[in-house]
């Protein structure tokens, strides 16, 4: 419900609500501003990919971004480059955590799990609406372009460990 309330109205294509959701008075304000279709609870449950759906589904138009949308003036950009992430929940959590850390965007390699997987979307907890993102056919090219524009690149891997607080990061 929270994610639905955060999406920009002009990006909403269709809205479907369960009968029980439509009957709850607490949802009147949420539904007042959109056209929606009421669906029998039994059918709604089949439409949803979760075991206990909240009663509202929306088809939302994707927003297209470029790397330029992520490059901030004054060398303030912090782009999260993700390569080959396979778990949808992990991808969504990384995007959500990145937003909390102040990233200006996310660039993913094309072998990363689908950003629009329902589990990924849910685990972003709305960050997908606020953080510019793109999937790149030229992942290395994006990293090089970011460096060319003054960005600093830090990498992680599973074979070593270091406390992120020990890094000297630019202000």
Model-derived features: positions:
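Post-transcriptional modification and biogenesis factors for structured RNAs
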Residues: 1-171
């Amino acid at each position: 419900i929270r994610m639905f309330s955060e999406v920009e109205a002009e990006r909403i294509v269709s809205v479907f609500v369960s009968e029980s959701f439509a009957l709850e008075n607490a949802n009147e304000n949420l539904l007042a501003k959109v056209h929606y279709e009421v669906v029998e609870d039994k059918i709604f449950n089949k439409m949803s990919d979760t075991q206990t759906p909240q009663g509202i589904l929306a088809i939302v138009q994707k927003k297209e971004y470029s790397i330029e949308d992520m490059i901030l003036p004054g060398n303030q950009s912090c782009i999260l480059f993700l390569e080959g992430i396979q778990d949808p929940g992990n991808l969504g959590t990384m995007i959500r955590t990145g937003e909390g850390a102040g990233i200006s965007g996310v660039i993913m390699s094309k072998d990363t799990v689908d950003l629009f997987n329902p589990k990924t979307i849910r685990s972003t907890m709305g960050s997908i609406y606020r953080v510019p993102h793109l999937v790149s056919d030229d992942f290395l090219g994006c990293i090089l372009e970011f460096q060319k524009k003054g960005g600093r690149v830090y990498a992680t891997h599973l074979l070593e460990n270091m406390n992120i607080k020990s890094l000297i990061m630019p202000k």
